[in-house]
């Protein structure tokens, strides 16, 4: 996370999300990295980016496993409430238009715009709903 945060910190318009980038691998239960932050020690943006990144990872094909369906990914997110994911952030994500995001992904979004734009889209969508 520190390399990405360093790059984004050089872009004035992106500085506000740098704390979220630095913390998006933290877990609510404190077993994340790089700092082992617990619960509210993790900035809201970090919780949102972490969930969006995890959803993208779960619903993407990997060399070692096929992509999960949206339903499987949502079930995994629910299973990890209070350990990996913040309950409020996850609730808003699940209640948001996840299926629209999924449809956009399936419609060539990933190839056309790249994964980072999908994570950004999901992050913005969840961030807007939480406010």
Regions found by a protein language model. Give the residues of each.
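Histidine- and acidic-residue-rich, metal-dependent catalytic cores
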Residues: 1-131
């Amino acid at each position: 996370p520190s390399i990405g945060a360093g790059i984004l910190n050089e872009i004035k318009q992106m500085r506000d999300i740098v704390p979220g980038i630095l913390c998006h691998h933290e877990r609510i239960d404190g077993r994340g990295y790089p700092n082992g932050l617990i619960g509210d020690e993790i900035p809201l943006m970090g919780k949102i980016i972490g969930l969006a990144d995890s959803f993208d990872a779960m619903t993407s094909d990997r060399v070692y496993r096929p992509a999960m369906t949206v339903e499987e990914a949502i079930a995994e997110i629910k299973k990890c409430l209070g350990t990996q994911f913040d309950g409020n952030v996850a609730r808003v994500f699940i209640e948001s238009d996840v299926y629209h995001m999924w449809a956009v992904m399936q419609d060539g979004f990933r190839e056309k715009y790249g994964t980072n734009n999908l994570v950004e889209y999901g992050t913005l969508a969840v961030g807007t709903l939480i406010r």
